[in-house]
């Protein structure tokens, strides 16, 4: 749009296969780079450690990540498929896309950002455990690692799957109340 009542921009989506495109980005044309560290949307997964390190070390743009550990999710999913087949109850979603999957992935992303000096923003923090990875001892203007939480992760718990079912099934999953 030539005019807008809102300030908007788009992120460039990263994959295991588009590193060269990411490295060519003009930072004036995008808000940052969005990476899915756990499979969630189409082929937007970035789980190749070499690709991740190259992205983190090669750009000054904001790197925004959806943090879920793919190996943990796959192992949890296999366990639930063994028990339920292809008809896994929705109230098991938080056990597949678990607290540990989120914590492991967020930990790795933060470690990589600290190692490379990258600007990192973690989307959709969904566990209290993940919040322990962040500090409020740094003035906001000096922070290079930030995060956000979605309201639904604050409002709903795993107990709500029984009454709301797929209406509250998203990634990262709604978790157990702390």
Protein language model annotation of sequence segments:
Residues 20-35, 41-178:
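Histidine/acidic residue-rich metal-binding segments in metalloenzymes
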């Amino acid at each position: 749009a030539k005019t807008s009542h809102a300030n908007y921009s788009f992120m460039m989506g990263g994959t295991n296969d588009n590193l060269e495109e990411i490295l060519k980005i003009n930072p004036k044309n995008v808000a940052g780079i969005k990476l899915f560290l756990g499979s969630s949307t189409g082929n937007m997964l970035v789980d190749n450690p070499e690709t991740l390190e190259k992205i983190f070390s090669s750009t000054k743009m904001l790197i925004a990540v959806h943090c879920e550990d793919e190996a943990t999710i796959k192992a949890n999913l296999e366990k639930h498929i063994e028990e339920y087949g292809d008809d896994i109850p929705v109230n098991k979603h938080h056990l597949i896309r678990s607290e540990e999957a989120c914590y492991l992935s967020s930990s790795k992303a933060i470690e990589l950002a600290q190692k490379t000096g990258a600007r990192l923003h973690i989307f959709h923090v969904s566990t209290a455990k993940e919040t322990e990875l962040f500090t409020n001892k740094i003035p906001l203007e000096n922070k290079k690692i930030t995060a956000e939480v979605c309201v639904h992760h604050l409002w709903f718990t795993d107990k709500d799957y029984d009454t709301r079912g797929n209406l509250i099934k998203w990634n990262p999953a709604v978790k157990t109340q702390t």
